[in-house]
A protein has these predicted regions:
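Alpha-helical solenoid scaffolds that mediate protein-protein interactions
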Residues: 116-119, 148-152, 182-185, 189, ...
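Terminal, low-structured helical/coil segments at or just beyond the last alpha-helical repeat
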Residues: 229-267
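Alpha-helical positions within canonical tetratricopeptide repeat
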Residues: 174-175, 212, 247
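TPR/TPR-like (Sel1-like) alpha-helical repeat modules
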Residues: 208-226, 250-258
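N-terminal Sec/ER secretory leader and immediately downstream segment
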Residues: 25-127
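C-terminal motif of bacterial Sec signal peptides marking the signal peptidase cleavage site
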Residues: 18-21
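Bacterial N-terminal signal peptides that target proteins for export
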Residues: 1-11
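Alpha-helical adaptor scaffolds
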Residues: 125-206
Length: 267
């Protein structure tokens, strides 16, 4: 009995370890073939996932050299720096005063990020426009991003989320419509960004549509390890009867299933 009761726990662990081993093999192959992509990032057990992402992004940029790959490397470098700062308790700007392999890795990552930031300031890639607007407060990048509204260039969930964020205060109903459209762009098996779900719940709360705020809070709970918006907490602000709650819970379950199947349709 003991053996069989442990199998559900052991099998996911075995699968996880297998995936980690495969990823390690891929990174090892990249570093063997192109040592320069890895040499400046110390492999000391800290920030291992972020380090692997940077190496992989460097490799893809080396192979294809597109602006999208430049953005992905910039994003991964930023995450690596954030992790390294946390693990060393050293801010990047102060790191030049200290010497250690991990600090050297921070300096190398920061230097490459600064270089890519400068190189891409004229790019019209929507992700890079967002980067330069949010990181450099570049009004021209914001204007160029907004000019792409309604075009195929923004037909991705992450970009619709960003667009909805722009209109959240000035045109909340438009922001809500954009969030629903973002969800409709997911295919079967895609990882749903829970920020879209929490944004919908928050937007509906702002419109005093408490039933929908509760419903989307409930949906968000299925896509987060630690829910940012709790349907239980939302219930504190607005009393929801038992029958209504059951109906909303069922509607939320239907939405969750549609999102997982990639069949969600905006209302």
């Amino acid at each position: 009995m003991t053996l069989f009761s442990q199998r559900p726990l052991l099998l996911p662990l075995a699968c996880c370890l297998t995936l980690m081993a495969c990823d390690d093999d891929r990174i090892h192959n990249i570093c063997t073939q192109s040592p320069a992509l890895c040499a400046d990032l110390v492999d000391d057990g800290w920030c291992r996932h972020e380090r692997s992402d940077v190496i992989r992004a460097r490799y893809y940029l080396q192979e294809e050299g597109t602006d999208r790959h430049r953005y992905e490397l910039m994003r991964d470098l930023e995450r690596y720096l954030q992790c390294a700062e946390h693990s060393t308790n050293i801010e990047y700007k102060r790191a030049r005063e200290q010497k250690s392999p991990r600090v050297e890795g921070m300096l190398a990552a920061g230097a490459q990020l600064e270089q890519l930031d400068a190189q891409t300031r004229g790019s019209q890639d929507p992700y890079l426009l967002l980067w330069h607007w949010t990181n450099n407060t570049n009004p021209a990048a914001r204007a160029s991003f907004l000019a792409l509204e309604g075009t195929p260039a923004l037909e991705e969930p992450e970009l619709q989320l960003a667009l909805g964020g722009i209109y959240a205060k000035s045109e909340p109903q438009k922001a809500i419509a954009l969030m629903h459209h973002a969800l409709s762009l997911y295919g079967e098996g895609d990882k749903v960004n829970s920020r879209i779900l929490t944004a919908l719940s928050t937007l509906y709360m702002g419109q005093k549509a408490f039933d929908l705020a509760y419903q989307w809070g409930k949906v968000s709970e299925s896509f987060q390890e630690t829910p940012e918006v709790s349907s239980t907490r939302l219930g504190i602000y607005h009393a929801i009867g038992k029958e209504q709650q059951e109906r909303l819970d069922q509607a939320a379950a239907t939405i969750v299933e549609a999102l997982r199947q990639g069949s969600y349709q905006a209302p």
